[in-house]
């Protein structure tokens, strides 16, 4: 039987993240929610502290994706996302860290988006940026012509003699999903060392690459918790199919005899609000609460909505005070500055 610590060793990987990230015991947050008589123990898995370009979960995916780009002798990477995409920001940084060029196709609802937050950082990393109009449905994160525009950009680059490597939105591919399959092993080992057996792990879910990796990791390493994904954008049916495909592609890469079906990949749809990238009242309240109690910053687009789901379950009594739960902090802090008006 393959040892868990050698499962990923044969795969190309570039060390971009500062690992392992710590597990933080949110004692004051628990106290604010009623103490140990009313609130479960809450742990934060601090993937906001991965280190790459202000941190975040994408560093784990990019360790495998950038390595694959280098293996294929790419000269540049191309990826896409919203104008305040955490993934785009971290991809730009990762590419620069290994000497690759970077081109971003970013969706926007403004013809001239302000140079702040992640968009400012993209420009500081010297990314070539193509802006396209976002789609009409704010709940859907991907623009209708996004894939076509990426293809056009890749064709243009190829004609110029470049060798572009395309990274899907969110780094959500079989290669990218390896990041959180490996990340699950890290969590399992930390929990064993701390003698902890949490019952559930909450995380924000967008393009579903993180979900795919966590689901694969759960089947490979059997953590004690069940996964509680919280959707931050719409398109659930299509995304379930995508997540299953990605997870199974990742399983094949590590030669794991695992099959994951779309029906297994459920996420909480109650906290999307008006749409992707649009803050919610409950999310903003969660940001303030966690900041004031723990000195930890969440972001309005992803982690605030996931924390709002966790808080709703605690307040409804769905999580017992005897339980321990984990919140996967996936980063995204630069987006706070792009949403400053929400806090006035």
Language-model features: locations:
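PLP-dependent amino-acid enzyme catalytic core
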Residues: 1-344
